[in-house]
Curated annotation (Swiss-Prot):
It is found in: Nucleus. SUPFAM superfamilies: TATA-box binding protein-like. This is TATA-box-binding protein. The lineage of its organism: Eukaryota, Sar, Alveolata, Ciliophora, Intramacronucleata. GO terms for cellular component: nucleus.
Length: 246
């Protein structure tokens, strides 16, 4: 009798295991389908829509104390007004950048359009200071912030976007015309305007900028203004029919 009960119990459990395996397979298929869909959507974003880098802020430690008055007197394109700002402001034409040089030996470089140019400019500033007579070293160069901008080519309904994404959105049109959108789990901040213009800031790499744009593009895609004629052509090209809110 015990062997019969065991066989019956085993027989009853077998279909449940097969169902669980089947469900697991279905879930994996769904995950793969979702991932492939996202990859396809990202590939369908035109290259010219991706953000162009507008400003890169980097820092470096020159590892020596600096006499800012001497630097301002002996270097070209340098100005120093300690009553206004406690740093020498120095400029380069190639690459077109501005450096803030502090007495502690810390330096901030702004205005470069690429990571390479930011590094190259910082090294040029360091050499200028070295030629003046300071024992400069080039240490701890780091990109602190990358700013990019783009135009998604369709107008956006900011009111509906703000209603559906309250956790991520700060929108006060009386104070600032754009919507401030903070990326979840990142430090990237997006300024989104009704015209479709977007500014992205807070990234450390170009890859961070592109990934943030890929995410926000498909969010904004669902908030196109309904009366935008160009959206229909865009939808046909992508073969996608999103829900559009007016």
């Amino acid at each position: 009798m015990s062997s019969d009960k065991t066989s019956q119990q085993t027989f009853k459990l077998a279909p449940n295991n097969s169902v669980a395996q089947s469900n697991s397979i279905d879930q994996n298929k769904n995950k793969n389908n979702i991932l492939s869909t996202i990859e396809t959507m990202d590939k369908s974003i035109s290259e010219d829509l991706y953000p162009k880098l507008q400003n890169i802020v980097s820092t470096v430690n020159l590892s020596t104390k600096l006499d800012l008055k001497q630097i301002a007197l002996r270097a070209r394109n340098a100005e120093y007004n300690p009553k206004r700002f406690a740093a020498v402001i120095m400029r380069l034409r190639d690459p077109k950048t501005t450096a803030l040089i502090f007495a502690s030996g810390k330096m901030v470089c702004t205005g470069a359009k690429t990571e390479e140019d930011s590094n190259r400019a910082a090294r040029k500033y360091a050499k200028i200071i070295q030629k003046i007579g300071f024992p400069v070293q080039f240490k701890d160069f780091k990109i602190q912030n990358i700013v990019g901008s783009t135009d998604v080519k369709f107008p956006i309904n900011l009111d509906h976007l703000e209603q559906d994404h309250k956790k991520f959105v700060q929108y006060e049109p009386e104070i600032f015309p754009g919507k401030i959108y903070r990326e979840f789990n990142t430090k990237i901040v997006l300024l989104i305007f009704v015209s479709g213009k977007i500014v992205l800031t807070g990234a450390k790499t170009r890859e961070n900028i592109n990934k943030a744009f890929q995410k926000i593009y498909w969010v904004l895609y669902n908030y196109q203004k309904k009366d935008y004629r160009g959206a229909n052509l865009h939808n046909q090209n992508l073969n996608i029919k999103p829900s559009i809110k007016n």
